[in-house]
Amino acid sequence: RFRHAAALLGALTAITLSHAADTETSPAKNAASADYIAGQQAVEAKQWKAAVDAFTRATLQDPKNADAWNMLGYSSRWAGDYKAAFAAYERALALDPHHRGAHSYRGVAYVRTNDLAKARAELATLDGLCGRDCEEYKLLAKAIAEHKPQ
């Protein structure tokens, strides 16, 4: 189970770091934010509270940054705060309804909270946005396939 979590974290981190260019939020804007960078570093180090704190500051500095909201959701989920995670994903998707990372991560959060119907709805959304070959779709499809009810 630990190896699976570590592999999933690695895949999520790779998607996260590569996804910024696919959204309406400018990667240059993210690069200029020391808090966003600190959040990314905390994610890479699996320091979830530090990541939540950094991405919270990043969203306060730039409330229209869908990537920062997405990463706040991601970090909150890993910290075990699903309520905060879902709220952050909602904000990211309100800003950018086509944000593949937010759809994928929210879908994984639905899997982790045993709401497979909503997870599958996110998967269908991703299929429409990027097809079945995009990393975000594959990640969520794998999480659904490997789900074991808790």
Question: Model-derived features: where do they sit?
Answer:
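Alpha-helical segment of the N-proximal tetratricopeptide repeat
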Residues: N30-Q61
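Helix-start (N-cap) detector for alpha-helical repeat units in TPR-like alpha-solenoids
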Residues: A32, A66-D67, R100-G101, D133-C134
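Structural marker of alpha-solenoid helical repeat scaffolds
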Residues: Q61, L95, G128-R132
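Canonical tetratricopeptide repeat
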Residues: M71, Y105, L139-A143
